[in-house]
Amino acid sequence: MDGEEHQIDGDEVNNHENKLNEKKKSWGKLYRPDSFIIEAGQTPTNTGRRSLMSWRTTMSLAFQSLGVVYGDIGTSPLYVYASTFTDGINDKDDVVGVLSLIIYTITLVALLKYVFIVLQANDNGEGGTFALYSLICRYAKMGLIPNQEPEDVELSNYTLELPTTQLRRAHMIKEKLENSKFAKIILFLVTIMGTSMVIGDGILTPSISVLSAVSGIKSLGQNTVVGVSVAILIVLFAFQRFGTDKVGFSFAPIILVWFTFLIGIGLFNLFKHDITVLKALNPLYIIYYFRRTGRQGWISLGGVFLCITGTEAMFADLGHFSVRAVQISFSCVAYPALVTIYCGQAAYLTKHTYNVSNTFYDSIPDPLYWPTFVVAVAASIIASQAMISGAFSVISQSLRMGCFPRVKVVHTSAKYEGQVYIPEINYLLMLACIAVTLAFRTTEKIGHAYGIAVVTVMVITTLMVTLIMLVIWKTNIVWIAIFLVVFGSIEMLYLSSVMYKFTSGGYLPLTITVVLMAMMAIWQYVHVLKYRYELREKISRENAIQMATSPDVNRVPGIGLFYTELVNGITPLFSHYISNLSSVHSVFVLISIKTLPVNRVTSSERFFFRYVGPKDSGMFRCVVRYGYKEDIEEPDEFERHFVYYLKEFIHHEHFMSGGGGEVDETDKEEEPNAETTVVPSSNYVPSSGRIGSAHSSSSDKIRSGRVVQVQSVEDQTELVEKAREKGMVYLMGETEITAEKESSLFKKFIVNHAYNFLKKNCREGDKALAIPRSKLLKVGMTYEL
């Protein structure tokens, strides 16, 4: 390179690609490379935290999952038959027909669909509606904010498959999705609908589970049952702050005992009353049931469906555990226990058709009644944990994707990533659960609402997994059709039945969903408008350099981090800042925090630098990339990493330019075309103290408020180190968002009132970014959107 900085343009890269691999003709279409795609730092392979998980850890997580995931589906036997036969049992054969429905619903939906298919659609070990959404966004540009960069696909956690001739169908669908704004909006709305329904489950599950268990004490009046239930709910939500791992280890033994009781009680009733109910294993009895009951049988499906409530928690809570752990615990413990207890209850009902309203407790052998009752109450409390944990997970994911107002997310386990607790949401859920319990008072009414929420999430999951099969897995079209037709038909049949009870309580989850969707949609809508405004009003690089190097602008010692959401271009806030303060730090960095559709980013891939102006200007751009499951580091740790990788970037650029001791004058007037991801030669990152070595010659680099021309890489890194010793200042825009005067009344209401109300009542941006208040300087500006 002879001491010259090597400039890379798009044509050179395209020619280089063609020479490297003529066969991969679809590469350009899939990745749309620009001039950064070849020179972007190649990252080490990351096989993911789940792949190397030991057998002991897997079994430990499987045990924990009993206490978090299966409480909901495990306590369904408390109320399924009572919710199905609301008008009593007219024919003993109806019991066999319903049992057959229950067995095949659990087998097909819970075991086959979720345990063996849906769990495979995880995002590097994370589950839930937003995990599916992020997975789709990673393979197709379906995000509503246009901040994707080609270098993002170089992250090890993207794990994209290289183009092959087998990708034609997937590529065609991907192209259509990327070019359709309507498809992007629909996918987003479906995603936040599923997320809202999961949060709604977190409200309804505790209410119905606790009420159903406490009602087992026949001597208690309804008012007392409701009062005791409310007290239990308060204790449950107060316990959440201790974290999922502690909750899991505390609750898992109880659920294990509960499942043991279910198996024992089920076998007891089978052998004592009527073992012939096992003929329900023949699916023909489902057909016979509908022939006899007709419309009433269809209505009863709303009660049958309750046997799989909580199934979605297996996927939503996946980030707390692992795929293998959930598969083991469900297949070996939960599934056999559930099938056994439902068979035993059916055997009891064939002899005691009049006891359907309290089937579970009446079928318990007398010596086991009180021990079972105590465990049932404990299990019902634990049942609530599944959807509470799921609600925390999906809110955390949606927050990192910019689709939820800022709230505090606490990671409760240093050992298991993905275990989170959100204080504000926890107490809001508690208040909502108490309100539902006091308003509905019985499990029958809550059950009507509960079914709608659960089955809607399942339908959404089926549709999104079908899309993943088409675009990502590239599954044979026959298997895709079978998956969609079989599970889609089952779930739509159940949905039609539960919607029949809309006026009897079914309106509640839809009301909750509408409110949450409106909140998330408003937040995302204004967030996109704000981003597009900054993109439209951004200032050019030349103007920014001219402003910063103007004789009227002083360069003060230190590092200034100017936060902007733009990953390309310079925010108009920069011009506003310069015109008002007339000073720029000796090392000035335009920094963007970007959340990618992966669950985590390794530290060596996190910082993405480039020069804004000439190399002696001390001006840089930095994109700091996080996964949607990560929190921003503490300030001291962030500053150490930032300075370390900034100096690595300077060394890298020096090496790429040929290692010359001086920078050619012509290069100082041009912005290099290539952004560079810093990949240090080792994984070492200093944990404390100074980073790098400082030379005495740097003492004169900053004089009289001006920057002296830097000639060597040592001088540049020394300047950065000296600036760090002077301290970092965090500069943030304090923008006031208003709608344009000519905007419609609806837009004015959304922007001026709804969004600003949410903004005032959520966490401030500097708190979300973990910025120390003592180092914060805010720049006020009004945006008219």
UniProtKB/Swiss-Prot annotation:
Cytoplasmic topological segments: 1-60, 119-184, 240-247, 319-327, 389-419, 473-476, 523-785
- Any one of the GO CC terms: plasma membrane
Q: In which tissues is it expressed?
A: Predominantly expressed in the roots.
Query: What does induction of this protein depend on?
Result: Induced in both roots and shoots by potassium starvation. Down-regulated by salt stress in roots.
Carbohydrate attachment residues: N355
> Where on the chain is Phosphoserine found, per UniProt?
S35
The UniProt keyword set, sorted, is: Cell membrane, Glycoprotein, Ion transport, Membrane, Phosphoprotein, Potassium, Potassium transport, Transmembrane, Transmembrane helix, Transport
Q: Keyword Zinc: yes or no?
A: no
**Cell membrane found in the keyword field:** yes
* Extracellular face residues: 82-97, 206-218, 269-297, 349-367, 441-451, 498-501
Location(s), subcellular: Cell membrane
Polar residues bias: start-end ranges: 674-686
The biased composition feature labelled Acidic residues covers 662-673
Which parts of this chain are annotated as the region Disordered?
660-699
As one GO molecular function, the record gives:
potassium ion transmembrane transporter activity
* InterPro entries linked to this entry: K+_transporter (IPR003855), K_trans_C (IPR053952), K_trans_N (IPR053951)
Query: Membrane topology type, per the record?
Result: Multi-pass membrane protein
Q: How does it assemble?
A: Interacts with ILK1.
- Role this protein plays: High-affinity potassium transporter. Can also transport rubidium and cesium. Is essential with AKT1 for high-affinity potassium uptake in roots during seedling establishment and postgermination growth under low potassium conditions. Mediates potassium uptake by plant roots in response to low potassium conditions, by a calcium-, CBL-, and CIPK-dependent pathway. Positively regulated by the calcium sensors calcineurin B-like genes CBL1, CBL8, CBL9 and CBL10, and by phosphorylation by CIPK23.
Name of the protein described by the UniProt record: Potassium transporter 5
The UniProt gene name for this protein comes to: POT5
